[in-house]
């Protein structure tokens, strides 16, 4: 019982207190590795330019995503796609949940909508839904590494 009370206090404080009290701009480079619902690898690199106004951040993201594919002979290749997202996440929660809506495009694919969810600090588990017409895999799971860097943020 003595151990449970401090744990409950910590969890209550973590989920009900404000994490940040700042405003301003930030830039956040990030990399990701993951698998799709068929077990194929994917990776990505992105840069987000965002505006931090308590209690949310909003950012524009530009990135590249590579999907590993195998042809009929078993030879692997990496197909590259460009993506553009509008992202937002809540600052007042310790788990930092976020959502992104955007478009992805490649050589063999027109602009296609994409949807992304994530949560966490610095290393973020993520889920993406991309309805690629030329592929039956639509669900993508990954782990992001990001480094948010403040640009003229007040309150630091």
PLM segments and residue spans:
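Residues that define the transmembrane beta-barrel architecture of outer-membrane proteins
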Residues: 23-27, 39-47, 56, 75-84, ...
């Amino acid at each position: 019982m003595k151990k449970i009370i401090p744990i409950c206090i910590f969890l209550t404080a973590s989920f009900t207190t404000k994490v940040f009290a700042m405003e301003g701009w930030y830039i956040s480079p990030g990399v990701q590795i993951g698998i799709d619902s068929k077990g194929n690898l994917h990776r990505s690199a992105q840069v987000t330019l965002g505006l931090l106004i308590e209690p949310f951040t909003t950012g524009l993201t530009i990135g590249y995503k590579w999907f590993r594919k195998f042809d009929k002979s078993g030879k692997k290749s990496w197909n590259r796609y460009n993506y553009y997202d509008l992202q937002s996440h809540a600052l007042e929660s310790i788990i930092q949940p976020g959502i992104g809506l955007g478009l992805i495009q490649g050589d063999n694919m027109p602009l296609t909508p994409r949807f992304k969810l994530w949560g966490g600090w610095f290393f973020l588990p993520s889920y993406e839904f991309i309805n690629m017409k030329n592929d039956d895999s639509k669900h993508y799971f990954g782990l992001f590494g990001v480094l948010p860097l403040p640009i003229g943020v007040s309150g630091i």
